[in-house]
A protein has these predicted regions:
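Conserved active-site alpha-helix within GNAT-family acetyltransferase domains
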Residues: 88, 112-120
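A conserved beta-turn-beta hairpin within the catalytic core of GNAT-like acetyltransferases
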Residues: 61-72, 82, 101-104
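Conserved beta-strand in the GNAT
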Residues: 51-60, 71, 76
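Conserved GNAT acetyl-CoA-binding A-motif
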Residues: 98-110
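A short beta-loop-alpha structural element at the N-terminal edge
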Residues: 2-16
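Residue-level recognition of the GNAT/N-acetyltransferase active site
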Residues: 78, 111
């Protein structure tokens, strides 16, 4: 399976025109995507294989008295592409971006019954 993992930057909106089923919770609005990508400290990694088949969104939380932290907001992979290590690759790429931005910690949360996410 040939999947490209890459960060989205402002102006990359066209890459998100084709999105596989169940990658995001709701339909992606172009205005929200543009605002998200333009916001300082907001980062998005996508998995591309004939369109977006996975996404990982994170925000940097900066503190006055301690090291910055990376908060992973969302991770989603289309069911047709799950169990191929895509989520792990996106998380690893996001952790690397966090380190580059000076984050000393990363936080990832999920629901107790989300067995696939807990396996990461």
């Amino acid at each position: 399976m040939n999947v490209e993992i890459r960060r989205l930057y402002p102006g990359d909106d066209a890459l998100v025109k084709r999105i596989a089923e169940d990658v995001f919770d709701e339909p992606v609005r172009a205005d929200r995507l543009s605002a998200y990508l333009a916001s300082s400290g907001h980062m998005m990694i996508v998995a591309l294989a004939d369109g977006v088949v996975g996404q990982c969104a994170a925000v940097i939380h900066r503190h006055l008295d301690k090291v910055s932290e990376l908060y992973i907001d969302e991770v989603g992979v289309s069911p047709a592409y799950q169990r191929h290590g895509i989520a792990r690759k996106m998380l690893d790429a996001m952790f690397a971006l966090g380190r580059e931005q000076g984050c000393g910690e990363a936080w990832v949360g999920t629901e107790p019954d989300n067995v696939p996410a807990r396996a990461l």
